[in-house]
Curated annotation (Swiss-Prot):
Its EC number is 4.1.1.121. Coiled coil: none annotated. It comes from Rhizobium rhizogenes (strain K84 / ATCC BAA-868). It is an enzyme of class 4 (lyase). Pathway: Carbohydrate metabolism. SUPFAM superfamilies: RuBisCo, C-terminal domain, RuBisCO, large subunit, small (N-terminal) domain. The gene is oiaX. This is 3-oxo-isoapionate-4-phosphate decarboxylase. Mg(2+) binds at residues 179, 181-182. Its cofactor is Mg(2+). One of its GO terms (biological process) is carbon fixation.
Length: 419
């Protein structure tokens, strides 16, 4: 039984030699033969090259300093199998072996991890999502359409009372989900304890009056797992049901510690992820990265969206959406995809079409809701109307003729600058 990692290698030298070196260095080998590296030992734990698929040569090196004075830059996808006996199901061991010293090997001008296939031994080895798609929809009371969410803006600087005033306006707008910006955790001007105490009475009062409980995701991340757990408990004990976790900041250990004790929906923000992926010739594909966090138990996963304000192209978002929506072992291990970043109703039709005509997502709009010319309530209605049009295959411009909120949204945001 093996774990198969696919590396996209770029080198002016031999692809085969690089593949063999990765397999050796990341399992039993070192720079010279050593006593004890027997054939029996290697048969149990040595990695093996399974296959090499040649790709078009690179036009320019990912790491230019490595390629000086060399010839063609050969590229190939290389599948390497690592025996489960060498790794087990520990995710820190898997990350160490999959990445480890690979990026420091001499002779390559680039390397990227583009796929990972886990054996059935990982099924049940980690908790996975506690709520996921079904739980998120149940707790928000949303069926047959996306969960519509927004973000407290300004992202930083509001005091708890000021935040609660804004939240009061947002929950009356008809929105399903509100979150702290990922940068907001527990600063001196807005301690989490005070923010929870100011916001949750508004949420609960609205629920009592209307029967609808808006899901609010509080930022609870902390480098100290015990402190993060105390933050979690503050939210849970006040009647909250969701938390923002900055997964790269808290790490595998922090996420594992939290998930095993959590009673909250865990909304994963991947800030810092771009360090690992923005260079197309190095780093790691999201298809690989997301598997770790899903096994650890994130319930909702932010993955950007269509025509975002950041660098990521639409094709990358579509691939990410497909990745988180594809079961690792069972449909219950899929988190809810979260489309965000510069979103408003204008991206709804393309999002719907390109993600397989699904409404199983959280559609997160900041300025696209709160900056609507007629206020947040009109902003929410405009996004809902856009999704109604998308699902019915009606062009937005046509639907807007009878829906003034959508019409005003198109007028403000269609140039791509407003949201």
């Amino acid at each position: 039984m093996s774990i198969t990692i696919t590396y996209r290698i770029e080198t002016p030298g031999s692809i085969e030699a690089m593949a063999d070196k990765i397999a050796s260095d990341q399992s039993t080998g070192t720079f010279v033969p050593v006593p004890g590296e027997t054939e029996e030992l290697k048969s149990r734990v040595a990695a093996r090259v399974l296959g090499i698929r040649q790709l078009e040569d690179a036009k320019r090196p990912t790491w230019p300093e490595v390629a000086e004075g060399h010839g063609p830059l050969r590229r190939a996808d290389v599948d390497i199998a690592f025996p489960l006996d060498a790794i087990g199901t520990d995710l820190s061991a898997l990350m160490t072996i999959a990445i480890g010293g690979v990026f420091s090997i001499k002779g390559m001008t680039g390397i990227r991890i583009v796929d990972m296939k886990l054996p059935n031994a990982f099924r049940g080895a980690h908790p996975g999502p506690q709520f996921g798609v079904a739980g998120s929809k149940r707790l928000t009371g949303v069926e047959g359409r996306p969960i519509i969410g927004t973000i407290v803006k300004p992202a930083l600087g509001l005091r708890p009372v000021e935040t609660a005033e804004l939240v009061g306006e947002l929950i009356n707008s008809g929105v399903d989900f509100i979150k702290d910006d990922e940068k907001l955790m527990s600063p001196a001007y807005s301690p989490l304890k005070e923010r929870v105490a100011a916001i949750m009475p508004r949420i609960l009062d609205h629920e009592q009056k209307t029967g609808k409980k808006v899901m609010y995701a509080f930022g609870i991340s902390h480098a100290d797992p015990d402190e993060m757990m105390r933050n979690h408990d503050l939210v849970l004990e006040a009647g909250g049901n969701c938390a923002v976790v900055n997964i790269n900041s808290i790490g595998f250990g922090g996420m594992s510690f939290l998930r095993k004790r959590s009673g909250l929906v865990l909304h994963a923000h991947r800030n810092g992820w771009d360090v690992l992926t923005r260079d197309p010739g190095a780093g790691m594909d999201f298809k690989v990265y997301q598997q770790f966090w899903r096994l650890l138990g994130v319930d909702q996963f932010q993955i950007n969206g269509i025509r975002v304000k950041y660098w990521e192209p639409d094709e990358s978002f579509i691939e990410s959406f497909k990745a988180v929506s594809t079961p690792l072992f069972d449909p219950s291990d899929c988190p809810l995809p979260v489309a965000g970043s510069g979103q408003w109703g204008g991206q709804a039709p393309e999002t719907y079409q390109r993600t397989g005509r699904t409404t199983d997502l959280l559609y997160l709009c900041g300025g696209g809701i709160v900056s609507h010319p007629s206020g947040p309530a009109a902003g929410v209605r405009a996004v809902q109307q856009a999704w109604e049009a998308a699902v019915a295959d009606i062009p937005l411009a046509n639907y807007a003729k009878d829906h003034p909120e959508l019409a005003a949204s198109i007028a403000k945001f269609s140039d791509g600058k407003g949201a």
